[in-house]
Amino acid sequence: MASQKGILLGFETMETPFMNTVEKSMRFVELVKSPYLQVYPDSGNLMNASLEPGAKNVYEDIELGRGHIVAAHLKETIPGHYREIPFGTGQIDFKRMVDTFLSIGVNRFTGEFWYVGQENWLEDIKFANQFLRSHFPNI
């Protein structure tokens, strides 16, 4: 149905072992074999998955999605925690993450950050915008 409307669907890499890597997402993309089903990796979820014993390096995992990534989801995390981590306070090397995605042709990005009731939410939005843009060339 989505293909009839030209809509692309992307599997977001999850917080759970079921589909927390590009490699796992690609299994379904290859099974379905539709140009309308692709991968939407979440940087934070990928990073935490890469910390599991025997896991691939996060940047090698991203490479496995070459040609099948519709956009990249930029989110900060710390080991074992996936939500409400402010940009720049966790484990993500955003420069390397962005460069890796750009190197395989990904040019669409989403930034995920959290409102947790803070009064200075507008400043948080401005900071997130500035922080993420600072990791892209020519912006």
Predicted regions and their residues:
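Histidine-acidic metal/acid-base catalytic patches
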Residues: 19-139
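Short, internal active-site loops enriched in acidic
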Residues: 15-17
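An active-site-proximal structural segment forming one wall of the substrate-binding cleft
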Residues: 1-5
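Residue-level detector of anion-binding/catalytic polar loops
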Residues: 8
